[in-house]
Amino acid sequence: MLNKNYNILVTGSNGQLGSEIKELSSNYFYNFFFTDRNSIDITSKDSIRSFCQTNNINVIINCAAYTAVDKAELDELNADLVNRKAVKKLALVSQDLNIKLIHISTDYVFDGRNFKPYCEELQTNP
């Protein structure tokens, strides 16, 4: 059943994955809210909560990430803030507000040659 009142927040909308979702969104009858680091601070629970409550968000698709792998090794604090701590805050707010959260991580973890579903215990092979 299509619900035009279904509100979906997509973080990281200027990145590669967020841009793809933005492009495909016109094929669906949902209300999409595309945000970037300037429109919502995902490192702040208050910012996330306020945005979600104001816009009656039903689902969060988190595409935001610190993806500059080489730079992240030199900027560990910011990489950790975006890739771990912000995700935790999104999860906590989602849980508190009964919002579904989809978190997508895309950078260089597995080689794609496995024929079974991947799990955290598998050896990485970027």
Regions found by a protein language model. Give the residues of each.
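Adenosine-cofactor binding site in Rossmann-like domains, unifying the SAM/SAH pocket
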Residues: 28-50
